[in-house]
Amino acid sequence: MLERLKAPWSAALQRKYFDLGIWTAPISPMALTMLNGLLIKDSSPPMLLHQVNKTAQLDTFNYQSCFMQSVFDHFPEILFIHRTYNPRGKVLYTFLVDGPRVQLEGHLARAVYFAIPAKEDTEGLAQMFQVFKKFNPAWERVCTILVDPHFLPLPILAMEFPTAEVLLSAFHICKFLQAKFYQLSLERPVERLLLTSLQSTMCSATAGNLRKLYTLLSNCIPPAKLPELHSHWLLNDRIWLAHRWRSRAESSHYFQSLEVTTHILSQFFGTTPSEKQGMASLFRYMQQNSADKANFNQGLCAQNNHAPSDTIPESPKLEQLVESHIQHSLNAICTGPAAQLCLGELAVVQKSTHLIGSGSEKMNIQILEDTHKVQPQPPASCSCYFNQAFHLPCRHILAMLSARRQVLQPDMLPAQWTAGCATSLDSILGSKWSETLDKHLAVTHLTEEVGQLLQHCTKEEFERRYSTLRELADSWIGPYEQVQL
């Protein structure tokens, strides 16, 4: 590893970066030892430019493996830039390829460059972009650069990439709005409505759907807070043209994949004050998940054959054995309908990638979606909708069992779902869809919701809501038939 580093770091290469105005001292043995754990194993030596201070902290860091350069050479048209801050305030810039031609699986398979600038000022960022361009002659083919809403150095991008168009990314706008919804401390039904509408719109970003979301924000957000959301972004058609080509399924997969990618970057770099340790942890993760290279080759073969690749790596035999035991325990312990619901959740677990972080009492389970809290102590519970609605083991609880090599136990679910204790539910859950029953359930649910709203309000608010409801009922069904409220 050390020899491979020394070879490419010649005097000629040092002069090349000196011509760029970048100071690079010869790499000392101590610095080489420090960086030894930072480099991804590759058949060819990677390109690395770094600068350390007296405390051995990384002042600047620019890294690209030959594999990453190869990915960029194939897909240079659209660059996606994501920033990750650590506790010291240092920022990791991750460059990823994007666009219709990119069909790569693997959470970091699209990453083509890592950089830590000395400072996020004009000089530091200009230097970072210049090194990226020096590493990648294909930079001239970059047509679009996608950034987050807080990305301020836009003039530097315009100067370094004069022919590229800089746009806000749909993913970063979505994350920005999600964070704002939580910060506003809205009523739970309103917050849930906004989050659901946002997710649906991002997966089908037509002009009509974006306009509906814009109107919904205008109606639900307090006027004084509305400017903070920059809802006018939803009406900027140029932003969404860069994303609209994806189908609903492709959009959902795209957002889920980026969600996990950014989570990985935050987990390894964003949680440690040492840039060196953060990058070492990130690169170790990439080494352990080196199947991304095979997926890259498969993606190229698929594109050359003009057919999408649907190759899915086989699960290890041990994992298959554990999941078969979980299936058996579900069938043995649960009622038929409950087992069917949980087996559907397990199917999602089997086809997904999960990140599991352990805590003292709770575990964070993420399956290519929002993070949920799992309470493993019986009866097991989770913060997701499935578990809250049915009180059954959800995909997150099943992922926890799979990771722990455990099976479902009777005390992990309520008694009403235990086999032999809920026969009255079989006819309902196993029945076919009925329009009459569907309407009845909808009316019942609506009646309960209205009743809850009328009960939990002041007398004045009750009178106002009741009179509004009375007017609606009379105008809809009356006036010849009195509606009993």
Swiss-Prot record:
Zinc finger (SWIM-type) in chain: 363-405
Chain segments annotated as coiled-coil in the UniProt record: none
Keywords: Metal-binding, Zinc, Zinc-finger
InterPro entries tied to this protein: Zinc_finger_SWIM (IPR052579), Znf_SWIM (IPR007527), ZSWIM1-3_helical (IPR048326), ZSWIM1-3_RNaseH-like (IPR048324), ZSWIM1/3_C (IPR045563)
GO molecular function, one term: zinc ion binding
PROSITE patterns: ZF_SWIM (PS50966)
One cellular component (GO) term of this entry: nucleus
Top-level taxonomic group: Eukaryota
UniProt keyword Transferase, yes or no: no
Keyword Metal-binding: yes
Protein's UniProt name: Zinc finger SWIM domain-containing protein 1
